[in-house]
Design a protein with these regions (language model features):
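C-terminal functional modules
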Residues: 148-255
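Structured, solvent-exposed acidic/aromatic patches
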Residues: 1-155, 193-201, 206
Length: 255
C-alpha cells in the first residue's frame, strides 16, 4: 500500500470520518448516554476507563481535556472507572468518575493518519518491512504529532522527549477497586536500544491512545499483541461463569 501510486492516509485532512448522522446523532454519544438517569450527570453507566486515564495521567498527556470530562472526586482532575467490576450506585458514586468528552455532533473517525503512521512504525521497527523512506522512530514520532494535531493540542515535542513518565497506579477514590500493580514500565520517548517486544509495546500503547473512540481497532491490536497492558477484571466483576479469562478479557463475540 505504501508503494501504491494511490498511497495511504498521511494527513489529518484525509482522515476517514462520518460527519452526518440521523436524528439521534453520533452513535458513540448515543451509547455513552444510554440508560442515562437524571441523577447521573456524566452519562449513563458509561465512563472513561481507568486504564487509559492511568496511562495518560502518568504521561501528563495534554489530550486528556479533549478525551475526558473532569471527575467530581476532590483533588483528582481525571480518574477513570475500572472495567470488569461490580458497578457501584451511579447516583452516589458512579457519577463522580470522568466521562467521555463527546457531543451529539462529534464526527466518528473510521481511520486516521496517526494510525497509518503507527502501522508503518510497527511494520518497520518490529517486523523489518520496507516502508520506503523513513525509520521506525520517524513513523512513531509522526503518529504522535498527527494525533496531537488531530485533537488540537500543543506540546508534542515535550511529550516525545519524556523519558521517565510511566502509567500511574490506579487508586480508586471510592476505595473499592484499586489496583496496586504497575500496569507497565513503558515510557514515551523512542529507544533505539529497545527489544522488538519493547518497541511493539511502545508503538501499540501510543497507537491505542491516539485511536481514542476506535474501540474495534484497539481490541484487535490487544488480541493480536497483548498491548497495551491492562487491568484484569475483578473476581466478583467477571460474570462470564468462567468463559472469559479475567486477565485476557474477551477474545471474540459469540453469535
Amino acid at each position: 500500500a505504501v508503494n501504491s501510486e494511490v498511497g495511504v492516509i498521511t494527513s489529518n485532512a484525509d482522515n476517514a470520518r462520518l460527519t452526518s448522522f440521523g436524528a439521534d446523532g453520533n452513535p458513540i454519544y448515543v451509547a455513552v448516554n444510554y440508560n442515562k438517569p437524571a441523577d447521573c450527570i456524566t452519562g449513563g453507566d458509561t465512563h472513561a476507563a481507568a486504564d487509559i486515564i492511568c496511562y495518560m495521567n502518568g504521561y501528563s498527556d495534554p489530550r486528556r481535556e479533549k478525551y475526558f470530562t473532569q471527575s467530581e472526586w476532590p483533588g483528582q482532575t481525571y480518574v477513570g472507572f475500572r472495567r470488569g467490576i461490580v458497578i457501584p450506585p451511579l447516583a452516589s458514586v458512579g457519577r463522580k468518575y470522568s466521562g467521555v468528552n463527546i457531543s451529539i455532533s462529534s464526527p466518528v473517525t473510521w481511520m486516521n493518519a496517526a494510525e497509518v503512521a503507527f502501522l508503518k512504525a510497527e511494520a518497520k521497527g518490529v517486523f523489518g518491512f520496507n516502508m520506503g523512506s523513513g525509520e521506525a522512530k520517524d513513523f512513531y514520532d509522526e503518529g504522535i504529532r498527527l494525533s496531537f494535531e488531530e485533537w488540537g493540542v500543543s506540546g508534542a515535542d515535550t511529550y516525545l522527549a519524556n523519558t521517565t513518565g510511566k502509567p500511574q497506579l490506579y487508586a480508586d477514590p471510592a476505595n473499592s477497586n484499586s489496583y496496586a500493580q504497575e500496569l507497565s514500565d513503558i515510557t514515551i520517548a523512542w529507544d533505539e536500544g529497545a527489544t522488538p517486544a519493547q518497541m511493539q509495546e511502545r508503538i501499540i500503547t501510543q497507537k491505542w491512545i491516539a485511536n481514542w473512540q476506535l474501540g474495534n481497532e484497539a481490541w484487535a491490536d490487544y488480541r493480536r499483541t497483548g498491548y497495551p497492558r491492562l487491568m484484569p477484571a475483578t473476581e466478583d466483576g467477571n460474570k462470564s461463569l468462567g468463559v472469559v479469562d479475567s486477565e485476557l478479557g474477551a477474545r471474540r463475540m459469540p453469535y
